[in-house]
Regions:
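Active-site HxH/HxHxD metal-binding segment of metal-dependent hydrolases
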Residues: 72, 78, 82-186, 214, ...
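Metallo-beta-lactamase
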Residues: 61-71, 169-177, 185-187, 192-256
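Accessory terminal helices/loops
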Residues: 1-28, 132-160, 165-166, 184, ...
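Residues that act as N-cap/strand-start positions at coil-to-secondary-structure junctions
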Residues: 23-24, 47-49, 172-174, 180, ...
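Short beta->alpha connector loops
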Residues: 44-46, 98-100, 199-201
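Conserved beta-strand hairpin/beta-sheet module of binuclear metal-dependent hydrolase folds
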Residues: 28-88, 208-221
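Short aromatic-enriched loop/helix-cap "lid" or pocket-rim segments at secondary-structure transitions
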Residues: 50-51, 129-133, 229-230
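Short Pro/Gly-enriched beta-strand edge/turn motifs at strand-loop
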Residues: 10, 32-39, 163-169, 189-191
């Protein structure tokens, strides 16, 4: 297990640059700026990883996102906390949005470190909604939605059969949280971050921007080599009409 330190690269070029040729390996942590650690956890999908950031906060650290809620991610966190992060104490967990690869281990981390969960209200309540949506009434509404959009019975049944996967990918959420909202400012160590929220990929996704250091944690709102997924769900079917014709530090792919 090792911690790799690299120098921050600044450039006036307009094109995106990727100063770190290698992403953190398994059980490794990379310091991408003073007091900013980057670690990467595996995902069981085609998009096979999620980036987690730790921000220095005095003698403690603030974690930004938690990873996928499965045994493999717990094992990876445990190895890191026994290795390069063995002296790390997480004082706050900021979760950017309600998708399982970001909120999945929130309950586990909050319990382990007795730290508060920090989210936007919409994203916290969206997580609660997903954990309680497996009722027959909701399944029937989803079935009707899928059929209206041309899916046959076989594919509809297959998709509905995945309905409980959210529960399998997310540890039990803490019963309370600390709310942050667009425009808030939060102090983390010597840095002051402005909270920016955005819709599209998620309803009210949290991003953090430190103007003094030109440091931006973009979550999944801005990705480096792919476009964020913007989906239309049964709970808000008219969204497809509203977005029709619109052109259109990331938490997937290399750090910018």
């Amino acid at each position: 297990m090792s911690m790799t330190k690299t120098e921050t690269v600044h450039s006036s070029a307009e094109a995106l640059r990727y100063p770190w040729e290698q992403h953190p390996g398994e059980d490794q942590v990379v310091e991408v700026a003073t007091g900013v650690l980057w670690l990467r956890l595996k995902l069981p999908f085609r998009l096979n990883h999620v980036n987690i950031y730790l921000l220095a906060d005095g003698d403690n650290w603030v974690a930004v996102d938690s990873g996928f809620g499965n045994e493999e991610s717990i094992a990876a966190w445990t190895r890191l906390l026994d290795g390069p992060l063995k002296h790390v104490k997480i004082s706050r967990l900021i979760v950017t949005h309600s998708h399982p690869d970001h909120v999945g281990l929130a309950g586990w981390i909050v319990e382990r470190f007795a730290c508060p969960l920090v989210m936007s209200q919409v994203e916290y309540l969206q997580s609660v909604y997903h954990q309680n949506r497996g009722t027959e009434e909701r399944r029937n509404a989803q079935r009707l939605f899928f059929r209206r959009h041309g899916m046959d019975e076989t594919l509809t049944d297959k998709l509905l059969g995945r309905g409980q996967e959210y529960l399998q990918r997310v540890s039990v959420l803490p019963a309370s949280y600390r709310r942050i909202s667009h425009g808030d400012e939060i102090q983390i160590g010597s840095r002051r971050f402005k909270v920016i929220t955005g819709g599209g990929h998620a309803l009210d996704q949290v991003m953090l921007y430190c103007a003094a250091d030109k440091l931006f944690l973009s979550a999944d709102q801005v990705l480096s080599k792919i476009s964020p997924s913007v989906s239309v769900w049964a709970v808000e079917p008219e969204l497809a009409r509203r977005i029709s014709g619109v052109a259109g530090e990331p938490h997937h792919h290399p750090a910018l």
